[in-house]
Amino acid sequence: MSITHAVKHKGYYYAPDPSSQLACSIGGNVAENSGGVHSLKYGTTTNNILGVEMVMMDGTICKLGGKTLDQEGYDLLGLICGSEGLLGVITEVTVKILKNPQTVKAALIGFPTIEDGGNCVTDINSNGIVPAGMEIMLSLIHI
């Protein structure tokens, strides 16, 4: 959320939106390969980082990736992303930011059953529509 806040005035945003975004750090997101409701369209953290600097367990400072998506060699960023801090401590991250969409629309749709809601999600995806986000909310609280 801080990344999006820092670039929104220039018309950009950072796509991953983990549910912990109000309290998490980008290093923690890399360590956990965090995702969120936008993961279907934009991927998780591993799909939205270009490079990292990290301190390895022996104290060595290591830089992986760069400023472009296409890097030669093995995908070491993919190895680090989701490693839960076991391979080192992330100290710097280069992220991919996206241009804000021209329009944003939201819809809230009710369904008689969870199965009907799930079928709607399946129908949307199977027809080639990839929304920026979809969530199913259960009515567990009745007033």
Placement of each model-derived feature along the sequence:
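Acidic, glycine-rich loop-and-beta core segments that form the ion-binding/anion-interacting portion
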Residues: 138
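FAD-binding subdomain of flavoenzyme oxidoreductases
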Residues: 1-135
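Conserved small/polar residues in nucleotide/adenosyl-binding loops
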Residues: 141-143
